[in-house]
Protein backbone atom coordinates (compact mmCIF):
# COMPACT_ATOMS: atom_id res chain seq x y z
CA UNK A 1 0.00 0.00 0.00
CA UNK A 2 2.80 2.39 0.64
CA UNK A 3 4.04 2.43 -2.94
CA UNK A 4 3.19 5.83 -4.34
CA UNK A 5 4.60 8.29 -1.86
CA UNK A 6 7.62 6.60 -0.35
CA UNK A 7 10.79 8.63 -0.47
CA UNK A 8 12.87 5.87 -2.01
CA UNK A 9 10.84 5.52 -5.16
CA UNK A 10 11.14 3.01 -7.96
CA UNK A 11 10.48 5.45 -10.79
CA UNK A 12 9.47 2.97 -13.47
CA UNK A 13 6.48 4.14 -15.46
CA UNK A 14 4.81 0.77 -15.02
CA UNK A 15 3.90 1.57 -11.42
CA UNK A 16 4.03 5.33 -11.08
CA UNK A 17 2.77 8.39 -12.88
CA UNK A 18 4.36 11.73 -12.14
CA UNK A 19 1.65 14.23 -11.36
CA UNK A 20 1.51 18.01 -11.60
CA UNK A 21 3.03 18.38 -8.13
CA UNK A 22 6.14 16.38 -9.03
CA UNK A 23 5.20 13.43 -6.83
CA UNK A 24 4.60 9.90 -7.97
CA UNK A 25 0.98 9.35 -7.09
CA UNK A 26 -2.15 7.34 -7.70
CA UNK A 27 -0.62 3.92 -7.18
CA UNK A 28 -3.04 1.26 -8.24
CA UNK A 29 -2.74 -0.83 -5.03
CA UNK A 30 -3.79 2.22 -2.97
CA UNK A 31 -6.68 3.12 -5.27
CA UNK A 32 -7.73 -0.51 -5.69
CA UNK A 33 -7.90 -1.02 -1.94
CA UNK A 34 -10.14 2.00 -1.59
CA UNK A 35 -12.24 1.02 -4.62
CA UNK A 36 -12.66 -2.60 -3.50
CA UNK A 37 -13.02 -2.16 0.27
CA UNK A 38 -14.07 1.31 1.35
CA UNK A 39 -16.38 2.15 -1.56
CA UNK A 40 -18.64 -0.90 -1.01
CA UNK A 41 -18.74 -0.18 2.74
CA UNK A 42 -19.74 3.44 2.10
CA UNK A 43 -22.32 2.33 -0.47
CA UNK A 44 -23.85 -0.16 1.99
CA UNK A 45 -24.19 2.45 4.73
CA UNK A 46 -25.57 5.02 2.30
CA UNK A 47 -28.14 2.55 0.92
CA UNK A 48 -29.37 1.93 4.48
CA UNK A 49 -29.47 5.68 5.12
CA UNK A 50 -31.38 6.30 1.88
CA UNK A 51 -33.97 3.70 2.91
CA UNK A 52 -34.48 5.69 6.13
CA UNK A 53 -34.64 8.98 4.21
CA UNK A 54 -31.30 10.22 5.56
CA UNK A 55 -28.57 12.09 3.72
CA UNK A 56 -25.61 10.40 2.11
CA UNK A 57 -22.30 10.19 4.03
CA UNK A 58 -18.75 10.68 2.79
CA UNK A 59 -15.40 9.97 4.39
CA UNK A 60 -14.31 13.33 5.81
CA UNK A 61 -10.60 13.93 6.22
CA UNK A 62 -9.98 16.92 8.47
CA UNK A 63 -6.59 18.56 8.83
CA UNK A 64 -6.31 20.37 12.16
CA UNK A 65 -4.44 23.38 10.83
CA UNK A 66 -4.91 26.18 8.38
CA UNK A 67 -4.49 25.18 4.73
CA UNK A 68 -1.36 27.35 4.39
CA UNK A 69 0.32 25.59 7.33
CA UNK A 70 -0.39 22.20 5.81
CA UNK A 71 1.07 23.25 2.46
CA UNK A 72 4.09 24.88 4.15
CA UNK A 73 5.24 21.66 5.81
CA UNK A 74 6.89 19.02 3.65
CA UNK A 75 5.61 16.25 5.91
CA UNK A 76 1.98 17.31 6.10
CA UNK A 77 1.97 18.04 2.38
CA UNK A 78 2.72 14.37 1.64
CA UNK A 79 -0.32 13.30 3.63
CA UNK A 80 -2.46 16.02 2.05
CA UNK A 81 -1.47 15.00 -1.48
CA UNK A 82 -2.33 11.36 -0.75
CA UNK A 83 -5.79 12.38 0.48
CA UNK A 84 -6.26 14.77 -2.46
CA UNK A 85 -5.46 11.90 -4.83
CA UNK A 86 -8.22 9.87 -3.22
CA UNK A 87 -10.63 12.78 -3.50
CA UNK A 88 -9.67 13.29 -7.15
CA UNK A 89 -10.40 9.64 -7.98
CA UNK A 90 -13.44 9.27 -5.68
CA UNK A 91 -15.09 12.72 -5.40
CA UNK A 92 -18.41 11.26 -4.22
CA UNK A 93 -16.74 9.38 -1.36
CA UNK A 94 -14.02 11.63 0.08
CA UNK A 95 -14.08 15.23 1.31
CA UNK A 96 -11.13 17.21 2.63
CA UNK A 97 -11.35 20.13 5.03
CA UNK A 98 -9.09 22.28 7.15
CA UNK A 99 -9.90 23.48 10.66
CA UNK A 100 -7.53 25.96 12.26
CA UNK A 101 -7.72 24.63 15.80
CA UNK A 102 -5.46 27.39 17.09
CA UNK A 103 -8.21 29.91 16.33
CA UNK A 104 -11.25 27.63 16.62
CA UNK A 105 -10.57 24.76 19.06
CA UNK A 106 -14.26 24.13 19.66
CA UNK A 107 -14.67 23.03 16.02
CA UNK A 108 -12.96 19.73 16.84
CA UNK A 109 -14.32 19.26 20.35
CA UNK A 110 -16.43 16.24 19.36
CA UNK A 111 -13.30 14.37 18.25
CA UNK A 112 -11.77 14.34 21.72
CA UNK A 113 -12.03 10.94 23.37
CA UNK A 114 -12.11 12.51 26.84
CA UNK A 115 -12.16 16.04 28.17
CA UNK A 116 -8.44 15.79 28.89
CA UNK A 117 -7.55 14.67 25.37
CA UNK A 118 -5.59 17.23 23.41
CA UNK A 119 -5.72 17.78 19.68
CA UNK A 120 -2.83 19.43 17.88
CA UNK A 121 -2.29 21.17 14.57
CA UNK A 122 -0.40 18.07 13.47
CA UNK A 123 -3.46 15.82 13.82
CA UNK A 124 -5.48 14.44 10.92
CA UNK A 125 -9.03 13.27 11.63
CA UNK A 126 -10.84 10.63 9.56
CA UNK A 127 -14.61 10.69 10.03
CA UNK A 128 -17.50 8.70 8.62
CA UNK A 129 -20.89 9.12 10.24
CA UNK A 130 -20.48 8.74 13.99
CA UNK A 131 -17.09 7.06 13.75
CA UNK A 132 -13.78 8.88 13.73
CA UNK A 133 -10.07 8.24 14.19
CA UNK A 134 -7.48 10.86 15.12
CA UNK A 135 -3.96 10.34 13.79
CA UNK A 136 -0.79 12.27 14.62
CA UNK A 137 1.18 13.38 11.58
CA UNK A 138 4.21 11.29 12.54
CA UNK A 139 2.06 8.14 12.27
CA UNK A 140 2.23 8.41 8.47
CA UNK A 141 6.03 8.19 8.42
CA UNK A 142 8.71 5.66 9.29
CA UNK A 143 11.50 6.76 11.64
CA UNK A 144 14.52 5.11 13.21
CA UNK A 145 14.16 3.86 16.77
CA UNK A 146 16.42 6.55 18.20
CA UNK A 147 15.41 9.45 15.95
CA UNK A 148 12.28 11.39 15.18
CA UNK A 149 13.44 12.30 11.68
CA UNK A 150 11.35 10.40 9.14
CA UNK A 151 13.12 8.45 6.44
CA UNK A 152 10.12 6.97 4.59
CA UNK A 153 6.47 7.73 3.95
CA UNK A 154 3.98 5.06 4.96
CA UNK A 155 0.89 7.20 4.56
CA UNK A 156 -1.00 5.17 2.01
CA UNK A 157 -1.21 2.22 4.38
CA UNK A 158 -2.20 4.36 7.36
CA UNK A 159 -4.73 6.38 5.37
CA UNK A 160 -6.25 3.15 4.07
CA UNK A 161 -6.35 1.69 7.58
CA UNK A 162 -8.03 4.79 8.98
CA UNK A 163 -10.65 4.89 6.24
CA UNK A 164 -11.40 1.18 6.56
CA UNK A 165 -11.63 1.52 10.34
CA UNK A 166 -14.24 4.27 10.20
CA UNK A 167 -16.26 2.81 7.31
CA UNK A 168 -16.33 -0.74 8.68
CA UNK A 169 -17.47 0.44 12.09
CA UNK A 170 -20.64 1.88 10.53
CA UNK A 171 -21.54 -1.48 8.98
CA UNK A 172 -20.79 -4.09 11.66
CA UNK A 173 -20.96 -7.76 10.81
CA UNK A 174 -21.66 -10.53 13.32
CA UNK A 175 -20.71 -14.13 12.60
CA UNK A 176 -21.97 -17.22 14.35
CA UNK A 177 -20.23 -20.54 13.97
CA UNK A 178 -21.67 -23.95 14.76
CA UNK A 179 -20.59 -27.58 14.55
CA UNK A 180 -17.27 -27.05 16.30
CA UNK A 181 -18.07 -29.42 19.15
CA UNK A 182 -20.45 -27.19 21.07
CA UNK A 183 -23.94 -28.29 22.09
CA UNK A 184 -26.69 -26.94 19.86
CA UNK A 185 -29.77 -27.91 21.91
Describe every region a protein language model picked out:
Residues 1-185:
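Short, surface-exposed patches at the edges or C-terminal ends of soluble domains, predominantly
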